[in-house]
Amino acid sequence: MELLSKFKEDLLCSLDAKEKSRFKCVKHKHQHPHLHPECKFCKNIKEKKDILFENDHIVVMFGRPHHKGHIVVMPKVHEEDLLKLHEKTLDSFLNDTVKVMKALGKAIKPDLYNLEYLDNWDHHIHWNIYPRFKSDPDYGNPPVIPDKNKKFKPKLLSTQEKDIFYRQIKRMKAGLW
């Protein structure tokens, strides 16, 4: 049985590689489409670092806290073009982003959200979700992102807000909404 399972894995990997040959698979010594060795998001996914939620298709993690509740949602596979995502992954990417926004909304009650989809900074498809509050100095404008090399005062969720958010994420994981 183990031999059959290994054969199936190798065959699927091989077929995948022929279809999307891009990244070297360390285990099978051929091109592999799943994770890019130079991508910081792929490294976090591989190491299970800072992940708040994951399913078969996406991962969710906190972003840089220059805006309170900044969340990043991304596919588990490394893809640089939204139009090339597999239909199931795209569906999860879009629908689960909305669910994460709802969970965050119950925790911190923002007035609105700004969503950013940028291809020019980190070449792994992802949404930046910025909860926005009328009290923000730049409310009504796109989020101001501090220079990567400059320090900023982190805007973190309170313990109570985190607890509410995590409870909502657990409900999401359990398929309760």
Label for each model-derived stretch:
Residues M1-W177:
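HIT superfamily nucleotide-processing domains
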